């Protein structure tokens, strides 16, 4: 027990302080008895003379009692004065990583290109024209017509090319030529329709102009006749008055 309470130097220091404060024994002395919770406390401080009516003695006694009051189940008194060193671990600084905004992936719209056929070109208003170069005319272009779809225009080119070059012709649809398929139907071009509409409008406007001029001439002749009649009547009246 005494080996476990290896704090004699601390006890001696406290004892010297207590004796200095008390200054000797008196009549009313308070001695620590066996009821002290620690046997080490009893063995070391049981012989100290403390006066009950002295406030300083009571203060020292209270301090000593509080200092050595611990759990009786513990046999190691070194916990009162010998605290284990606390290892201070460095705190890790967690820096919040800034999330970079995700770059918007540009949606690349793959433009679907229309298939290009030999001898076919698209008109500005959406129709498809077919033409071919005639080797007999020094490569001059021969107009084959305008069609609703590019396939019809390509078929018209194939028919004309096969007629000009025979089996040596480069065709868009080799299997469709001479297969009994009917020829593609041409459509009237925009220019022809516009010219026909303009000619019809011009003829109608010219007819309207002729009709207006005819009506004006009729009105003028009627007015002239009326004036002549009035003049004739006035001359007759004058002759009658003179006579």
Curated annotation (Swiss-Prot):
**Keywords of the record:** Activator, DNA-binding, Ethylene signaling pathway, Nucleus, Plant defense, Transcription, Transcription regulation
Q: Where do the record's region annotations for Disordered lie?
A: 181-219
Q: What induces it?
A: Induced by jasmonate (JA) and Alternaria brassicicola (locally and systemically). Ethylene induction is completely dependent on a functional ETHYLENE-INSENSITIVE2 (EIN2) while wounding induction does not require EIN2. Transcripts accumulate strongly in cycloheximide-treated plants, a protein synthesis inhibitor. Seems to not be influenced by exogenous abscisic acid (ABA), cold, heat, NaCl or drought stress.
UniProt key word Ligase = no
Q: Which cellular compartments is it found in?
A: Nucleus
Instruction: List, in alphabetical order, the GO biological process terms annotated in this UniProt record.
Output: cell division; ethylene-activated signaling pathway; induced systemic resistance, jasmonic acid mediated signaling pathway; phloem or xylem histogenesis; positive regulation of DNA-templated transcription
Any one Gene Ontology cellular component term annotated for this protein: nucleus
Composition skew (Low complexity), residue ranges: 192-206
Q: Which SUPFAM superfamilies match?
A: DNA-binding domain
Mind listing where the DNA-binding region sits, in residue ranges? 116-174
Keyword Kinase attributed: no
- List the Gene3D superfamilies hit by this protein, alphabetically: AP2/ERF domain
Where would you find the membrane-spanning parts of this chain?
none
Which coarse location class describes where this protein primarily resides? nucleus
InterPro entries noted in UniProt: AP2/ERF_dom (IPR001471), AP2/ERF_dom_sf (IPR036955), DNA-bd_dom_sf (IPR016177), ERF_plant (IPR044808)
Which PANTHER family is this protein grouped with? DNA-BINDING DOMAIN, ETHYLENE-RESPONSIVE TRANSCRIPTION FACTOR 2
Q: Which family does it belong to?
A: Belongs to the AP2/ERF transcription factor family. ERF subfamily.
What UniProt notes about the protein's domains is: The AP2/ERF domain binds specifically to the 5'-GCCGCC-3' motif. The affinity of this binding is higher if the seventh amino-acid of this domain is basic.
Query: What does the UniProt record say this protein does?
Result: Acts as a transcriptional activator. Binds to the GCC-box pathogenesis-related promoter element. Involved in the regulation of gene expression by stress factors and by components of stress signal transduction pathways. Involved in disease resistance pathways.
Q: What is this protein called?
A: Ethylene-responsive transcription factor 2
Q: Which organism is it from?
A: Arabidopsis thaliana
